[in-house]
Every structure is written in C-alpha cells, then in structure tokens.
C-alpha cells in the first residue's frame, strides 16, 4: 500500500 498515493481513472498519479 502506498501512503497518500492515489491513481485517478484517467491514469494520472496524485500524491
């Protein structure tokens, strides 16, 4: 699990 790391449905990485 990445802490505070999410990936949007569009494929962009958001920290």
From Swiss-Prot:
Superkingdom in the source lineage: Eukaryota
Protein name: Unknown protein 17
């Amino acid at each position: 699990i990445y802490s505070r790391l999410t990936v949007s449905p569009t494929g962009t990485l958001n920290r």
